Amino acid sequence: MSSVKRRKTEKNTSSGLKSKQAKEPKEASPLSSPEPTEENQNNEIEEGTEEEEVTKSFKDLGIVDSLCEACDTLGYKAPTPIQRESIPLALQGRDLIGLAETGSGKTAAFALPILQSLLDKPQPLFGLVLAPTRELAYQISQSFEALGSIIRVKCAVIVGGMDMVPQAIALGKKPHIIVATPGRLLDHLENTKGFSLRSLKYLVMDEADRLLDLDFGPILDKILKVLPRERRTYLFSATISSKVESLQRASLKDPLRVSISSNKYQTVSTLIQNYIFIPLVHKDTYLIYLLNEFAGQSAIIFTRTVNETQRIAILLRTLGFGAIPLHGQLSQSSRLGALNKFRAGSREILVATDVAARGLDIPSVDVVLNYDMPQDSKTYIHRVGRTARAGKSGHAISFVTQYDVEIWMRIEAALGKKQEEYQTVKDEVMVFKPRVEEAQRHARNEMKNLHEDRGKKGAVLKGRRPANGAKRGRDEMDREEG
């Protein structure tokens, strides 16, 4: 099948499609920033806003020269607001609750103080970071190793879905930092001979609200019981909830709270947000139209189900787009491979379930397309947070069908502002319809073959009972739904 993907050359005029310059979309006004709030005088609260002075360097915050050099090497020109507010407090030895939007630099905000303390008093098993997903755990470890390269920090990633024996060997080598998903860490605490965290100095719970959304609460309780009381604890999250408040009371001592966004559903000011109201039957056609509008830019397309992720990836590849799927039913190596290809630019479109919506380090995403609407405002915030990161601009467009109007109205209400519609010309969109329909037929056949292959494999395994059911359950919890 011939490609419908617009390429930025004169050959577009012979493709059979109407050739035109991608017009500038009608921009929605960026969400207004919250008014600066006065610092709460309560000893437990330390508020910050993005209006504060931005000229401070990492050295001004108290970071030592060797770590400042690492920041410079990684291209960290100046601290982000969450880093400016939290690092000095962490260096004072306080427990912290850090609240800031996705993409604000939370990882360096807790990694730098831990590495500086490790530099002063080096010891094995110094810090533990708990993360909700395997991908996020790997990325946090990479950040620690990059920032701590000068001091040769050693990290171990302990996550579900991987062989426990190599992990036990890695723990036996006494790394400085462990980054783990809760279920697999508890497996090792209970079953790996000689492994304990009695000497731990730092605990970080990253994406704490997501940890609790995935029902890790009981496992976290068990982990907290075996950790030393004399430790520093940092809890970082994009949003706050009653569950997070309960976790804070159970695990932190007299914490200071750093909050960069006073609005629970705040998005960054460099993000353009639009919606497009379309009939359900034409979603694929509008998707191809938009991808041509944003030709040459990287994009994440969010879907609700694994099947839809697979189908759209096949559809796009059939039409000549470099698309790759990411969802929770892929093997760990396949998921990491998909992310690496997308980061490297060998694939420009990532089609993903919400497994990709939280914490993933993909700094160059230009466009987020909500092909399927998220079911709540919090998920929407984390999806669109994949673009407009670290001060860059970005664009998010949500597909609103006749069945999504109520959800979209709730999201707009939570954001506190109505979004503008992305302007399209129906005749220009429908030019793509014949080729899209042909690609849809091909995708349906491919999906049918895929399901038949899976059915055959399932028949072979039918009736087998997995050994060690409890351990398997924890591994399943370590995997993101979808």
UniProtKB/Swiss-Prot annotation:
Which family does the record claim for this protein? Answer: Belongs to the DEAD box helicase family. DDX47/RRP3 subfamily.
Q: What is this protein called?
A: ATP-dependent rRNA helicase rrp3
What are the Basic and acidic residues biased-composition ranges?
A: 444-456, 472-482
The residues listed in the UniProt record as binding ATP, with positions renumbered to this chain, are 100-107
Q: Which organism does this sequence originate in?
A: Sclerotinia sclerotiorum (strain ATCC 18683 / 1980 / Ss-1)
CDD domains the record matches: DEADc_DDX47, SF2_C_DEAD
Name one matching Pfam family.
Helicase_C
Look up keyword ATP-binding and say if it applies.
Answer: yes
